[in-house]
Amino acid sequence: MTENPTTTAFNELQTRPLATILARNDWQNPAITSVNRLPSHTPLHGWRDADRARRGEPSDAVLSLDGEWQFSFFASPHQVPEVWLAADLSDARATPVPSNWQMEGYDTPIYTNVRYPIPVNPPFVPDDNPTGCYSRDIEVPQAWLETGRTRIIFGGVNSAFYLWCNGQWVGYSQDSRLPAEFDLTGVLHAGRNRLCVLVLRWSDGTYLEDQDMWRMSGIFRPVSLLHLPEQALADVRVHTELAPSLRHATLFSEVEVTPAACGLSVTLALWHGENEIASQTLPLGSAPIDERGNYAERVTLSLDVDNPLLWSAETPHLYRAVVTLLDADGMPLVSEAHDVGFRRVEINNGLLTLNGQPLLIRGVNRHEHHPEKGQAVDEAAMVQDILLMKQNNFNAVRCSHYPNQPRWYELCSRYGLYVVDEANIETHGMEPMSRLSDDPVWLGAYSERVTRMVKCNRNHPSIIIWSLGNESGNGATHTALYNWIKHQDPTRPVQYEGGGADTRATDIICPMYARVETDQLIPAVPKWSIKKWISMPGETRPLILCEYAHAMGNSLGNFADYWAAFRQYPRLQGGFIWDWADQAITRVEPDGSRWWAYGGDFGDTPNDRQFCMNGLVFPDRTPHPALFEAKHQQQFFQFRLVSENPLQIEVTSEYLFRESDNERLLWSIEVRGETRLSGELTLELGPQASRVLTLSDTGFSARAGDEEIWLHVRVEQPQATPWSPEGHLSAWAQWPLAAPLALPEPVAAGDAPQLEITDAEFVIRHGCQTWRVSRASGQLIQWSDDGVDQILTPLADQFIRAPIDNDIGVSEVERIDPNAWVERWKAAGLYNTEHRCLACDAQTTRDGVEIVAQHAYFVKGVADGPAILSRWRMVVDNQGALHCDIDIARSAALPPLPRVGVVCQLRGGEETASWLGLGPHENYPDRLSSACFSRWTLPLSELTTPYIFPGENGLRCNTRELNWNGWQAEGEFHFSLSPYGTRQLMETSHWHKLQPEAGIWLTIDGFHMGVGGDDSWTPSVHPEYLLTAREYRYRFTLRRRQG
């Protein structure tokens, strides 16, 4: 709770020595969350001009204190000398505010997910408690000293802090993610004023801030002074009500003035651009509340609005409400202004609705994190994230797991994103998680974090849901705070996942990582499949996954399954992917080279290594390939092939409110990646409308021998929007079309290849090509063309992959999960096999030379029979092509294989490769709905994905032809080309440490296991994407490039 001592008591404390103030030990007392901090309220700017307030121009009443402060660092608050309050210390260094001191060279950033970064002994924290001492000299305008009141506003300080001004103690605060304001009126004077802020890294609040993130400290959000007149607006709440017809609305503004005075009145004016829609002026004083009367300092104003433009993420129409306090003569004293969005959020008949329409949440979780600035995120970074989210078909964001800066909500309201605002509460590392949530000693601390969030942020139309916090179990505190919010703000639902995602403290079933079809029977809190959950007896609430599709590294497999379910079952209303961006930190070496660091790279303990990197984008916001899968599945236009002749498709708009007034549909028919027919038309669809479009009255006339015929459609925006550039691609689809039956064109017979047999090799020659197969190994050890070797290592079976994060799960050196795929592969010996050639024979046939080799793979040190058998049939034909037919048989004792394919190292050469298959981005068998079948060309550098923690990457599936360096591969296969071999990927901890090898590694897979992604700590690859068969067969052809 907030401690507000009597004036006499506090005046006595103000002048006490620093050591006396620190001896209060407020940071280890959950009953004290602040001292002398002002009550929470919606943001104030103190405009003296209502027009400037309406336009949102900078206020003369606000003085930013961002910039350089002097900073000294100590290992403990008790080491800070008293003299610091009067003058900077000799070791003080200029440090930017806002910033985290760990990003400025002090102390160590710590990344941990669940484990607390300190020994668990609430409310106590270690005596060794890193402490930052910030100081700055300021001058305030003389007019501010003569009249009115001046307060200082800290946007965010982690974890707790004390404030002094001119040597006098002003107050104390904790809760690192909400503003803290203090009145400085009595301590400011003319000339230089010295501000001193002592920030503690750890406090009892640390036990409530156990979020999965980097643990950093300091003044990391803006700091400013605000000057208000003696009679000022203390709080301004605005909210809207819509009639069921949506044609009539009322804007309410509940205003509080401090101090109350006779004769004051308040004006509420609503503006749309330069047009005033309506206004009202009322004297101060509320209607009677109870038998004891009314609030003299409050008034509620209301404006009726007909046919308002409604706010949604699709059509973010905003108005501006300006509230002005008038003196007894009707003269303006001060104004405040807020964006207003007319919208109604409800849960009706088991559906979350906005303006009467059921929402489909295309959401993502977002931490405030910047690779160079830590948790000090500026407006440019916020806008960058919002634009990328909108461009990739997201319509919602969850503030995981704490309130963001006020500017974030304003930007979401203006660009159009639905927001879940979440209280800064997580006790994931407690055992049980509910320990503090059910302890009345902590009730006040919990309560302030929830109630202050609501009071501060409730005016933002983008916020459609409140969240009580994250992963804190379920206690009586949650029920109490749920009821408080429902009483204070009945216009929004409340969600909370803790305690099983469906407790009485949530209006929405909001599980994390629940599967589509499979139950997870976790003790006490079973996690049902999402389809089952909504059908449980008596359950009528909507289900929205607060976290799903764990996007850690090479992930997001099975994502399409979620979206098929969302579209099939109305009460499955989407979810929030975990999460937006990799939380890595940029490190700069003395030579200027830069790389991205994760947990443990700073010597931080405890740490959870690379588990901070779960993003759809890299730290610099470059997309992961998984982002394209999310964009495609979430696209607002859905397509269906109706007929091939005439060529017709059906297009359905999933927009709820906007017409397709800026969309162009382009279509093409490709034959083996070459465009044969194309066209475009303007796409005109109303909200939620469908339309059949005829692309060609006569269909497509295929020629004899045509194959791989595909119809492609894409929707682009010809005009730029506030969030997208001209020509932005918003949706796409493709279908294979029927190919005519035809016999292949006969090929003139060429010269027969010649077979030479030596004691060691079978040597085959055809023209200027030579192939050598070792009789001992049964492997192709040389392929030369014009005397130039094409392969640097033998062409060999490959059954392993460099483990991806989803393969590793929670396994670490000190904590092994035997159920993780990588541990099962290790235990089965897949990474430690011994190859033996059982037989290798060659013969000349009518069509060429045939070599048949039998291979066996034994687990080293295991006396049992072979784990895997392979049979290769290699044929060099009279065209100089090498055909490889491969049969695989595996032991029933083996776990599912990561891959069934071949690998070799090729000589270097061309810088680009082209292929006919799925692309252009990386794709895997369970993550390929966004990839399109066509002919693609990319630089080799873009054929690998530089996941910060290296692993399997860069696969392109369903390939029919691959061309590189003068040769081509044909067949039906998946491939990758990489300068890094599997072993190096396995043995290297960071991408920047990889060293290009002598050539380029080629993998050709007949089969490849999925990557999974329902979560990253259980084996989440679905059965249909596991390689569990006992036998496999595939084939491919290698030849000199044709044409």
Swiss-Prot record:
Na(+) binds at D212, F611, N614. Binds 2 magnesium ions per monomer. Binds 1 sodium ion per monomer. Residues 33-53 are annotated as: Disordered. It catalyses: Hydrolysis of terminal non-reducing beta-D-galactose residues in beta-D-galactosides. One of its GO terms (molecular function) is carbohydrate binding. The record marks H367, H401 as: Transition state stabilizer. Keywords: Glycosidase, Hydrolase, Magnesium, Metal-binding, Sodium. This is Beta-galactosidase. It comes from Cronobacter sakazakii (strain ATCC BAA-894).
